[in-house]
Amino acid sequence: MKAFSSYDEKPPAPPIRFSSSATRENQVVGLKPLPKEPEATKKKKTMPNPFMKKNKDKKEASEKPVISRPSNFEHTIHVGYDPKTGEFTGMPEAWARLLTDSQISKQEQQQNPQAVLDALKYYTQGESSGQKWLQYDMMFIDDAPSRTPSYGLKPQPYSTSSLPYHGNKIQDPRKMNPMTTSTSSAGYNSKQGVPPTTFSVNENRSSMPPSYAPPPVPHGETPADIVPPAIPDRPARTLSIYTKPKEEEEKIPDLSKGQFGVQARGQKAKKKMTDAEVLTKLRTIVSIGNPDRKYRKVDKIGSGASGSVYTAIEISTEAEVAIKQMNLKDQPKKELIINEILVMRENKHANIVNYLDSYLVCDELWVVMEYLAGGSLTDVVTECQMEDGIIAAVCREVLQALEFLHSRHVIHRDIKSDNILLGMDGSVKLTDFGFCAQLSPEQRKRTTMVGTPYWMAPEVVTRKQYGPKVDVWSLGIMAIEMVEGEPPYLNENPLRAIYLIATNGKPDFPGRDSMTLLFKDFVDSALEVQVENRWSASQLLTHPFLRCAKPLASLYYLIVAAKKSIAEASNS
């Protein structure tokens, strides 16, 4: 690669936003009220049975009573809405407090009371225990929490909004022999019933044409020279969430159908895997051997309550990788670990962060991924003004990943800038598959609410069945994010934001008037409220807006500019 000299003409600096859209201050997130203490109940005295034999009495007295778990229990909900008074009736006290603080006006409540109940149900069902395994507990030693790691790690000199899995030395999986994509290093075993996958979708589409050579790095600069210190993160409410499926919950009365005071019977939840079952399953996935003999750790780039992230070198190839070491005992959703590893291992693509290997070392799981130094798209979005050509290029790369996943009946369900990772060569890759869903022929739709609220499609927020097009909606919101620096409703109360998504559908935003007609049509095609009218990923790849895409190498200068802006803001 030719280095810049003093005689070379450097391109103009990328436009920087006058003020960063990243949140610089810690924001207080309201805590849910604690449940009331159960009232003490007096034990009922039983009359002795005079017909019982004494020896039988002694035997029964020595035995401890066996109490079975409750079955066929009922939870009664009586929530109604009185249009005359404009008030909800029978609403739990905790819900009433949330509604009072939500800034949802009385007029809005009257216009769509069902949307209010849906929003309340979603907000109260969100559980921190359902966060993805890539996200650690929010534990920071310094006063200013890290802005970039969405998994809550305390960053070291380098940080990203998600696990920084990238690398430029990994062979393009579309050029690999389909029968060798799942190698022994990835822990593949023919007895597992998960055969190697082929790549039949868009094999001739290149994510970076040969003419798009990576830009030269200025003389004397390396990616390590431009790594900034960490700055505060986005609000905690932008973290991904998980709520249990509808079939596991108590029903909410559908006010649109005149259902007031519905009695809901609790149904059996899906059986949760035990720790022993998780370990047994992981042993069929991971590689056997000592990872220290294959990889040499270089730098620790993050740490948290249950693990650490390192950059490392594969000894045999000298390729740079990322290794995440996790203590399985500290992972709240161990099943998601298995889900993510299996999905990434069996769905390799040039626009998806590659899973390379995994090992079980005592109680620790080591996951090896490819590593890219560019960080997440969030840094570029919040610090730089992106041209239409750059936005089109990013959207094209993400759509290629989505088209590939959807063709294999996989829904990502958490598309946002935090989960788009960049290489210094301009490569764009999708990561974080902790919430992805595999659809079977028998189950073409999902009802589980997952993802991040501000990027959620209306059918997800309203808890309807949904399919792959929820990813397309999230891509449309991400396109707005690249224009505005943040998604719509980010400054609204979270409960009100959920209500607005369910009620308004396609959001309005200030920068819309300055967009070109082609860009507007592209966003509108992705943000169709009616799912049948919303374009698919394959259809959007044919949209004329993508023809204005600039070379991916142009992203290099935006990445550098964003890092410098973050460093200056941190030092000021």
Curated annotation (Swiss-Prot):
GO annotation terms (biological process) = cell migration; cellular response to starvation; embryonic body morphogenesis; embryonic morphogenesis; gonad morphogenesis; hemidesmosome assembly; inductive cell migration; intracellular signal transduction
Sites binding ATP sit at 301-309, 324
According to the entry, every stretch annotated as the Protein kinase domain falls at 295-546
EC code: 2.7.11.1
Q: What is this protein called?
A: Serine/threonine-protein kinase pak-1
- Knocked-out gene: effects: In pak-1 and pak-2 double mutants, defects in embryogenesis and L1 stage lethality. The few animals reaching adulthood have normal ventral cord commissural motoneuron axonal guidance and are relatively coordinated. In max-2 and pak-1 double mutants, DD and DC motoneuron axons fail to reach the dorsal cord. Animals are also uncoordinated, defective in egg laying and in distal tip cell (DTC) migration, guidance and morphology, and exhibit ventral enclosure defects.
What does the entry comment about cofactor binding?
Divalent cations such as magnesium or manganese.
- Predominant location of this chain? membrane
For this protein, the record's InterPro entries field holds: CRIB_dom, CRIB_dom_sf, Kinase-like_dom_sf, PAK3-like, PAK_BD, Prot_kinase_dom, Protein_kinase_ATP_BS, Ser/Thr_kinase_AS
Which parts of this chain are annotated as the region Linker?
81-294
Sorted alphabetically, which PANTHER family does this protein's record hold?
A: SERINE/THREONINE-PROTEIN KINASE SAMKA-RELATED-RELATED, SERINE_THREONINE-PROTEIN KINASE SAMKA-RELATED
Gene that specifies this protein: pak-1
Q: Which organism is it from?
A: Caenorhabditis elegans
| MF-aspect GO terms | ATP binding; GTP binding; protein kinase activity; protein serine kinase activity; protein serine/threonine kinase activity
Q: Which Pfam families match?
A: PBD, Pkinase
Tell me the cofactors it needs.
Mg(2+); Mn(2+)
Q: One GO cellular component from the entry? A: perikaryon
